[in-house]
A protein has these predicted regions:
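Short helix-boundary/capping micro-motifs
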Residues: 12-29
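Central regulatory/effector-binding core of bacterial HTH transcription factors
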Residues: 91-154, 158, 243
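A late-sequence structural motif
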Residues: 274-322
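Alpha-helical linker/hinge and terminal dimerization helices associated
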Residues: 7, 43-44, 65-87
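A short LG(V/I)-centered, amphipathic sequence patch enriched
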Residues: 41-58
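Secondary-structure junction motif
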Residues: 148, 181-187, 193-233, 296-305, ...
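Hydrophobic hinge/microswitch elements
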Residues: 129-134, 138-142, 148, 215-273
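Beta-alpha-beta core module
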Residues: 155-165, 169, 247-295
């Protein structure tokens, strides 16, 4: 009988490529990973790994075994969810990951609702960048998380994980309002938009092609979104400041130090002192992520329900099409 824990190691090796990466991700020593994979090889009765210089490569038999391992591990997640549902009451830890704007604007109310409905649950929140969620879920560091994607930044394929839509939000071009010391004023963006009729996105962005831009740090989805949106409008942004916190981004914009693209939840409201907000046609889509098979787990389902009940009025009901 093949050992499930060793199958998990083989699956991680298929994803990460090296024994060292598997060891680091799962907090094992490389020698322990090699030893357990050797035992799995004996259990299988076939070679699973081929040496390639300093690394290893999966044999065709191992690749086939990984496909079966994916199905087995998903079924185990479902079994765990059904067992949890059969127990009376929800209790125990629920490890939650969320990105900063959701952590500020939505998660506190959701956790308060969850505590009222299920006092036996112990939610544990970690602020987590969406780019790190897949690893944290697979490693068992999180049970459920919020991730987001933007126009121009497609969702990556994440085998073994499932996502469900939560909400969409509008995106805005933030520019300094007209006034003393404002070099890049709102006047360049044209007439003020209405919620139902935003201006042409390319025109709004091109109006500030010569402005200094404020983006998130490279490697983040927010950075890629801004750069690709500008490129689609026909120019590359001249990035001067790299800041991840949207409150700081808006403070820099208000000081006349540049322009930026920000999501709806990244603003305190439609009126930001010193900042002109121009709605764009692009959106940010937020989804609930969990390991495949775990969606029916009562704790995960309860948190998802609390999230939906906590959505601000401007976002409520928008998840179905996200």
């Amino acid at each position: 009988m093949l050992d499930v824990r060793r199958l998990r190691l083989l699956r991680e090796l298929a994803r990460r490529g090296t024994i060292a990466a598997v060891a680091e991700a799962l907090a094992y020593s490389p020698s322990a990973v090699s030893q357990q994979l050797g035992v799995l090889e004996r259990e299988a009765g076939l070679p699973l790994l081929e040496r390639t210089g300093r690394g290893v490569r999966l044999t065709p038999a191992a690749q086939n075994l990984v496909r079966h391992a994916e199905a087995v591990l998903e079924r185990l997640e479902r079994a765990d969810a059904e067992l949890a549902e059969a127990r009376t009451g929800l209790a125990g830890a629920l490890r939650i990951g969320a990105f900063p704007t959701a952590t500020r604007a939505i998660v506190p109310a959701a956790l308060a609702d969850l505590a009222r409905r299920h006092p036996g649950l112990e939610p544990m929140l970690s602020e987590t960048d969406p780019a790190a969620v897949a690893h944290a879920l697979r490693a068992g560091e999180l049970d459920v998380a919020l991730v987001h994607s933007y126009d121009f930044v497609p969702d990556p394929e994440e085998p073994g994980l499932t996502t469900r839509p939560l909400y969409r939000e509008a995106m805005y071009l933030a520019a300094p309002a007209a006034g003393p010391g404002s070099t890049w004023s709102a006047e360049k963006a044209g007439p003020a938009p209405t919620p139902d009729a935003p201006p042409g996105q390319d025109e709004a962005l091109r109006a500030h092609r010569d402005a200094p831009w404020i983006t998130a740090t490279p490697g983040t989805l927010c950075h890629a979104m801004t750069v690709r949106a500008c490129q689609a409008a026909g120019f590359s942004p001249r990035v001067r400041h790299r800041v991840d916190e949207f409150a700081t981004v808006l403070a820099l914009v208000a000081a006349g130090l540049g322009v930026a693209v920000v999501p709806q939840l990244g603003t305190p409201g439609p009126d930001v002192p010193g900042v002109a907000l121009t709605r764009l046609r692009m959106e940010r889509r937020t989804r609930i992520a969990f390991r495949s098979g775990a969606g029916a787990h009562p704790a995960v389902a309860a948190f998802a329900a609390s999230l939906r009940s906590a959505l601000p009025p401007g976002l409520a009901g928008r998840g179905a099409g996200a």
